[in-house]
Amino acid sequence: TPTCGKTIKALISLLLAALAGATLGHAASAPLNRLSEDVLDVVPPSSRVSGPPGKMTIRQGSCRSIGLTDIRRRIVDVATQEWGFFGFSVVDQTSQDPERSSPRSIHRPPRLAPWESLRVADSIAGYWTVTPDRSWIIERQNRVWSGPSGPSARWRDPWSAAFISWVMCEGGIAEPNQFRRASAHHVYIDQAI
């Protein structure tokens, strides 16, 4: 419906903006545990996979249809819970960075530390489980984890689109005609346009 389409477009914009701030982080607090299922009925992404890094397999890839009642609030709640799980990271691009030698120097956002990469590995794998590319992405990451860097290796593939796909899935949007889950942002942005 037209109203649903406008809502989806607004939610995509909101999630992309939040994701830009949430995953690049300069300032972050300690990560929080997720809320219990009786407080926020969400399938934790980590429960969608099993096994340790290097031997991870997919347990669940489907999304449940919850209905469109109060969907905006649910999507925001799901995304906020994950932001807390990652420590409420915030990027302030309006301030000067004293470590940059000049305004034109390359700025690279901080990455997760090896211990943090290991802590969130199954959650990020869980995000991938709702995308069409889930099997080969997780298999390729298993090979990375089995390599020289070991289980604390960072994700080989950018996972922000998988995260947004998972948020929309857990938000209750199960039908591809409402939101096409994907491993690349352009897929659902094209759908929204």
Tell me what each language-model feature is.
Residues G25-S29:
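Boundary at the C-terminal end of the N-terminal hydrophobic targeting segment
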Residues S13-A22:
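Bacterial N-terminal signal peptides
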Residues S36-Q178:
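N-terminal capping segments
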